[in-house]
Design a protein with these regions (language model features):
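Short amphipathic alpha-helical interaction segments
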Residues: 83-100
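Minor-groove-contacting beta-hairpin "wing" of winged helix-turn-helix DNA-binding domains
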Residues: 113-117
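Short, amphipathic alpha-helical interaction segments positioned at domain boundaries
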Residues: 119-149
Length: 149
């Protein structure tokens, strides 16, 4: 992970995920296929997605939580013209549920920001996944990207 997002990020390696000009691309996940495609002189991209507005908002939310362990919700509201508590009402409810990350001490939700705690660092991917709308719509039983432990 990185603390500051650049304008474009090209993925290198098996299963790498790149972010170029508003689109995500994931490299081949099998090593043999990755090298087969490279040897044929092509980029080893398995799939890609053009991001819509909601994707961009969620990407920023997830990236900032995972890379900075902190999310300035006021800044996000300003950047995207949203009211964070309304836009992410369902996600905030999941975070604050009786058996959710807040109750386990992984996350602190304060006015204007969300912070991953010291203990929460070990579970930051699990917390960030709450903001990933595609995980909810998955029906194949296979992970979309990588799994957490």
């Amino acid at each position: 992970y990185t603390v500051k997002m650049g304008s474009d990020m090209v993925a290198v390696g098996v299963s790498g995920i790149g972010d170029v000009r508003g689109a995500f691309a994931q490299n081949e996940k099998k090593l043999s296929r990755y090298y087969e495609v490279l040897d044929a002189g092509r980029f080893p991209v398995e799939r890609g997605y053009a991001l819509d507005r909601d994707d961009r908002i969620r990407r920023e939310t997830i990236t900032r939580l995972m890379c900075n362990l902190w999310l300035d919700t006021v800044a996000l509201e300003s950047e995207f013209g949203i009211v964070f508590a309304e836009y992410f009402a369902a996600e905030l409810a999941r975070l604050s549920a009786p058996d959710g990350p807040v109750s386990h001490g992984f996350v602190a939700i304060e006015a204007g920001h969300i912070e991953i705690t010291g203990l929460g660092r070990f579970f930051v991917r699990n917390v960030a996944m709450i903001f990933d709308r595609y995980l909810e719509s998955r029906t194949s039983g296979k992970p979309i990207f990588s799994r957490t432990v």
